[in-house]
């Protein structure tokens, strides 16, 4: 559904503006909750945009879930559309797990204080950060950008766009 939602958003803006458009749809998918909150991430608590209530509801839903079963991933679909209707949608993910409590930091929004990205490790040619069991909210913007679902989706779009455009 993320891809479908991204396409709907892109089509709407492209039709209104007459210009090529990029739109995304993203969310958090928790294994123990059968993928919820998923496409309803922004309104998981029942209304749109209440990060604190969404976090509280997620923590309550995960209260009895043991450490080894708290897998989750952020998912992003990015859609590029041309005024003629041709479009390209690319997906990105960041795997991780849900913390037992908020791991607040100086950055982030939404579920960032609850999401611990999988350790990316650090190698000589690897520019991704070692996440060291830090939440998204505890990573600097540059660290988060290097591993994020949106960053991964945009990198894939950048890779596929030239052939899509016939360049």
Short names for language-model regions:
Residues 1-167:
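Anionic-ligand binding patches
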């Amino acid at each position: 559904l993320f891809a479908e939602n991204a396409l709907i958003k892109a089509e709407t803006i492209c039709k209104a503006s007459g210009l090529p458009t990029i739109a995304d749809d993203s969310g958090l998918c928790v294994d123990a909750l059968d993928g919820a909150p998923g496409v309803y991430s922004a309104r998981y608590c029942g209304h749109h945009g209440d990060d604190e209530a969404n976090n509280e509801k997620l923590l309550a839903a995960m209260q009895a879930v043991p450490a080894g079963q708290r897998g989750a991933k952020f998912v992003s679909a990015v859609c590029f559309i041309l005024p003629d209707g041709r479009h390209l949608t690319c997906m990105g993910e960041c795997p991780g797990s849900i913390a037992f409590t908020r791991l607040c930091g100086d950055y982030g929004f939404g579920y960032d204080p609850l999401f611990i990205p999988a350790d990316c490790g650090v190698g000589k040619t690897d520019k991704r950060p070692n996440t060291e069991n830090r939440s998204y909210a505890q990573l600097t913007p540059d660290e988060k950008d290097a591993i994020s679902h949106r960053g991964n989706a945009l990198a894939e779009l950048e890779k596929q766009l030239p052939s899509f455009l016939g360049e």
